């Protein structure tokens, strides 16, 4: 399962849509961290094509992966240039795989990359 999520992130780094057809189930539900939800492989492919026309993923570094049964959680750092603006954030992806080893459900969650320490006494 970890190999598949790494392959998926690599698709973004290389702007390579071809492997997505083998990574995702036809009936996948993909929920982005800021609200959009893509229903089915066709919508995921459309989003991938359209996003990559305006943006480039600069980094998608996996920090850790936890897997149990058919479920995987990956913590990562993501950075991109979209419409000329570079931004990045920390995040977590929760993935459920189907019986064929394809991604049936993927949900992303975002956290600020910059942290502050409100109780730091320095």
Describe the function of each predicted region.
Residues 2-3:
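Amphipathic alpha-helical repeat elements characteristic of tetratricopeptide repeat
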Residues 6-10:
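Amphipathic alpha-helical repeat scaffolds
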Residues 29-39, 51-54:
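A short gly/proline-enriched turn/hairpin at secondary-structure junctions
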Residues 45-122:
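A beta-strand edge to alpha-helix "cap/lid" segment located at domain peripheries
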